[in-house]
Structures are given as structure tokens and as C-alpha cells.
Amino acid sequence: IKVTVADESHIKYAEDICKEIYISSLERKTGIANRTPEYICEKIRAGKAVIALAIPDKASTAPDEASTAPDEAGSKQESKDKTEQENGSAQPDEKFAGFSYIESWGGKSFVANSGLIVAHEFRGLGVAKKIKEQTFILSRHLFPDAKIFSITTGAAVMKMNYEFGFRPVPYTELTDDP
């Protein structure tokens, strides 16, 4: 599984992402906010999204080798990205495994890690944790002074939030934006 900041080459997964969010909202019955493909594309184009992709023949790649954080980018990643852009997509047979994006409020003083979703067939493999970690790194990279939060109704994400050092706070303390 490769977890990376989403870019233009990942726009093609917007429909899959929306379908997975919709299916999960029906299954969980907890009011997961559905998103449109246009909204997902907007987040991807703005550099405010993280995507996980399953890449055949790379299943044995260690998580650290397969993940690329913004602050770890260096020239190795830049040259890899340039090659991928020149060749179109990195792998034509890669498969959507998960996604998350960030939102900012209060003059960029508050940043939410939102929309965390993992495709059914990749659940229970640690994909959500890798996405969550990359989303946090991206949030800190883009908004270094912001308070980062994660709103969730799911027990698994609550547990992850605790492990990442998030603390529970009332919604009224987060931001005054509508």
C-alpha cells in the first residue's frame, strides 16, 4: 500500500472515494457526510488530500518505504513525481485503498483531518492509521501554527485519535466558523 499526498493523477479515484463514503454512511448509520466527486477533486487539486493505493507486486513493501510525507519529500520523491507525471499515472493497475482530506477554519487557525475512508477490502490492515499519520503531517506542513482536530463518530477513529495524541473537546471549543 502506497500512502501519499494526492495530486492531479489521482482525480480518477474521486467516484470510487464517494461511493465508499456513501456505502459506509449506509452501513454505519451515523451521519457520515457524503461528498461529491467535485468536492473530492477540489481537495486533491488544492494539495489538501491523502490517498492510499494498493499497487500489485509491491505488497511486500514496508510501510515506511511506501509512504511519502511532505516534509520527507526531498529530491528522491521529486524525481519520482516528475517521472510519474511524464508517464501519466504511476501504475495503471493501482487500486484505491483509502483517502482523507483537510479543512481549515478560523483564518487557518483550526484544521480538521476529515473524510477518512478505507475501502472495505483493505480494512483491518493498518491503512487507516497510515492515512491518518500522513494527513496529520500534511496538516502540520500546510498549517504549522493551527490547532488540528478530528471529528468522528466511529470508535476505531476515536481510538486512533487517542493514540495520535488528540484529546476530546466539546465541539463549541473548536471554532466559531459556521
Where are these regions (language model features)?
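A short beta-loop-alpha structural element at the N-terminal edge
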Residues: I1-D16
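Intrinsically disordered, low-complexity terminal tails and inter-domain linkers enriched
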Residues: P56-D93
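Conserved acetyl-CoA-binding loop-helix of GNAT-fold acetyltransferases
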Residues: V118, G124-S139
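Conserved GNAT acetyl-CoA-binding A-motif
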Residues: S139-T153
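Extended, composition-driven regions rather than compact fold-specific motifs
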Residues: A156-K159, P178
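Conserved active-site tyrosine of GNAT-family acetyltransferases
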Residues: N161-E163
